[in-house]
Design a protein with these regions (language model features):
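Hot-dog-fold acyl-thioester-processing enzymes
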Residues: 2-70, 116-189
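HotDog/MaoC-like acyl-thioester-processing domains
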Residues: 1-19, 77-140, 197-251
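Long, charged, glycine-rich C-terminal linkers/tails
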Residues: 71-75
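Structured core of small recognition/catalytic domains
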Residues: 159-229
Length: 251
């Protein structure tokens, strides 16, 4: 694993993995075979966060462990990914992709390292969550730009350090479903900026706001701006990552 930005002569990092639908029983029924078929898909979709997790090893081989502390990625999801398919992930300098065996894109994005002079990110205030049975149904009336989201807290648990980026991004999904009733819905892409290293076992707090709402080809999209924070050794709340999470809440 390298410890600096990739050089011109550094070969691309390529990994292969068999896709696994990690959320067939989730509240988001786009991952359920029967529901997904009704929306024109072959079967339940492998979560976009899982596809992102498949790309992380290639990113780390190119950029090194430092990327976990101050790395960034902006990616979009393209073709649906299904259980059992072979996913080929490649990071060649700043370009990262996840493809099927025919070379069609599941996801593509750009990777970078943050400059230390970028300054402290915006800190989002904490708000209470709605009660589970009083969550509003996601709609053009309830999903509005500027709406603060109720905050979530939980312990960071990842199988290994390289799984932490996927786990952090999964919290973006979690804060949405803790604030709204949305099903089915689809993750469309994310921009992630790591600010410092998150560690297994830390209590993570996620806060944010609905930043933007728009419609494209009859589908309703929204963008959530999120801050993921921990308490440091001095007890101060500090941001470990910021996320702009784009999703389709009405298919």
């Amino acid at each position: 694993m390298h410890d600096e930005n990739p050089t011109v002569n550094q070969p691309a990092s390529v990994f292969r993995v068999r896709a696994h639908n990690t959320a067939p029983d989730s509240e988001n029924k786009i991952h359920d075979d029967k529901v997904a078929v009704k929306y024109g898909f072959r079967e339940g979709l492998v979560p976009g966060v899982t596809v992102y997790g498949y790309m992380v090893p290639a990113i780390l081989e190119q950029f090194g462990r430092g990327w976990l502390e101050r790395g960034a990625v902006a990616f979009r999801l393209h073709l649906p990914c299904y259980q059992g398919e072979t996913v080929v992930t490649r990071c060649d300098g700043p370009v990262v992709t996840a493809e099927n065996e025919n070379g069609s894109l599941y996801a593509s994005g750009m990777v970078s390292m943050n400059e230390k002079s970028d300054g402290e990110p915006e800190v989002f205030p904490s708000y209470p969550l709605p009660e589970e049975d009083r969550r509003p149904v996601a709609s053009a009336q309830t999903m509005v730009a500027g709406l603060p989201l109720g905050s979530i807290r939980q312990k960071l648990e990842a199988a290994e350090e390289t799984a932490i980026p996927e786990r952090l991004l999964s919290l973006a999904n979690e804060i949405l479903v803790r604030n709204f009733r949305m099903s089915p819905w689809i993750h469309a892409g994310s921009e992630v900026r790591h600010q410092r290293l998150a560690k297994n076992g830390q209590e993570i707090a996620v806060s944010g706001v609905i930043q933007e709402c728009f419609e494209r080809k009859g589908r309703k999209f929204a963008v959530a701006a999120l801050g993921i924070s921990v308490h440091d050794d001095a007890g101060q709340l500090c941001t470990v990552a910021t996320v702009r999470h784009t999703f389709i809440y009405e298919l």
